[in-house]
Amino acid sequence: MAEYSGPAKPTLALNPREDSQFEKDLTQIQRRAKKKKEEKLNSGVVYLGHLPSTLSESHIYDYCAQFGDIRRFRLSRSKRTGNSRGFAFVEFESEDVAKIVAETMDNYLFGERLLSCKFMPREKVHKDLFNQCNVPFHPPSFPAVKRYNQKRGHLQMLKMEYRFKKKEKLLRKKLAKKGIDYSFPSLVLPKPKKEISSIANTHGDSEANQDPTPVCTPTFLERRKSQLMEINDDDEIILKLPVSPVKEDTQKTPAPESSGKKRLRKRKSKQ
């Protein structure tokens, strides 16, 4: 008796020797059937705009799947932040279903917003519109952002400058080969020149203006004295104290002088 080799395969020929040929014929028949379905049903693409930022791919897909079978779906997201841009593209298997969805859903109040739903003809649908639509979304990696914005050393900065200059040369060569006369600023900014030369020039001018060796003549000495006096006069600060009003009154009203005659009269009367 033959040993039991597990459950029977779904595509199994009556003659076990003809299994491989039978599978090939079956796959060809399935492909032809799919092509016939695609020829019968022309797909239609719908543009959805003014979408709330809180909606994700699963929410919009489940909502649109109520109208008919969806072939492809894509929600536009920012590559830098990963947030929704507020518009999406839905491809229905039937073009008639897509037109019905565009008519019914246009200006529909959804999440305090009026949706804009438009049917896109085949001429306006780009061939790369649904590229990587089946790939799940991954937010941008923040370690890569930190690595890009990190503080670099002197050697790392030199390597970056070398790479930028190399790219700039290649770009200029490509433009020259194509005959494009286009001038653009360099990718690496020129380093600012140090102000040593300007400082040296100022010192040289000041030394040149001075006399080489001043002669001690009487006119020169008088000039020096007058300069010193002006400096001392500027440095002096005179403080004036306010005069109290009581002293002024005392000065204005002097005390009366006592007369000696009155004293003598008093003594005589006592005697």
Swiss-Prot record:
It is found in: Nucleus, Nucleolus; Chromosome. The modification Phosphoserine is found at S226. Residues 44-122 form the RRM domain. The modification Omega-N-methylarginine is found at R113. The modification Omega-N-methylated arginine is found at R223, R224. Residues 261-271 have a biased composition (Basic residues). SMART domains: RRM. The modification Phosphothreonine is found at T213, T217. Phosphorylated. It holds the Pfam family RRM_1. The modification N-acetylalanine is found at A2. The keyword Phosphoprotein applies. One of its GO terms (cellular component) is condensed nuclear chromosome. SUPFAM superfamilies: RNA-binding domain, RBD. It comes from the Eukaryota. There is a cross-link at K37, K178, K191, K247 (Glycyl lysine isopeptide (Lys-Gly) (interchain with G-Cter in SUMO2)). The keyword GTP-binding does not apply. Binds to the FHA domain of MKI67; this interaction is enhanced in mitosis. This is MKI67 FHA domain-interacting nucleolar phosphoprotein. The lineage of its organism: Eukaryota, Metazoa, Chordata, Craniata, Vertebrata.
